[in-house]
Regions:
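Short, low-complexity N-terminal intrinsically disordered segments enriched in polar/charged residues
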Residues: 1-31, 124-126
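Short beta-edge strand/loop motif at the mouth of beta-sheet-based domains
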Residues: 41-51
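Generic signature of intrinsically disordered, low-complexity, basic-rich segments
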Residues: 12, 29, 48, 111-113
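A beta-strand edge to alpha-helix "cap/lid" segment located at domain peripheries
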Residues: 1-5, 36, 50-126
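General structural signal for alpha-helix termini and helix-helix connectors
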Residues: 12, 35-38
């Protein structure tokens, strides 16, 4: 996969989150993908990843959007890092935090999504 194709995959992956399209997110992930949440939980396989994302996509935490600030891709290793601001609209008003995802990609699919956030404590439970 060349650099432009990898960057495009990361953009489409992020856009699927912003479109609240869980099926679109999962379509870009390998069957045996791993998603490590910033609070430490590790989800292995699409079924576990789906279960981890359902509350977010169902709107349990409010409306969520990830605005990219930086994107670094290494096509030779199939890895990308995207730094973002998560903007959240809740019943109590707007909230947000900064974070990043390290994505490992093989054969055009995300095999690992490692999420890190800039917060003192996890902001979302569940």
């Amino acid at each position: 996969m060349d650099r432009a194709t990898l960057a495009d995959l990361v953009v489409r992956f992020t856009e699927a989150f912003n479109a609240n399209d869980l099926e679109g997110v999962l379509a870009l992930m390998a069957e045996d993908a791993v998603y490590e949440e910033f609070a430490g939980a590790i989800n292995r396989g699409k079924a576990a990843i789906r279960a981890a994302f359902v509350p977010q996509f169902r709107g349990d935490f409010g409306k969520m959007r990830f605005d990219a600030e930086d994107l670094f891709v290494d096509a030779d290793s199939g890895k990308a890092l995207i730094r973002w601001v998560c903007r959240l609209e809740t019943k109590r008003g707007p909230a947000g935090w900064r974070g990043l995802d390290i994505l490992h990609v093989e054969n055009g699919l995300v095999t690992q999504k490692l999420t890190y956030a800039k917060a003192k404590v996890p902001l979302l439970d569940g």
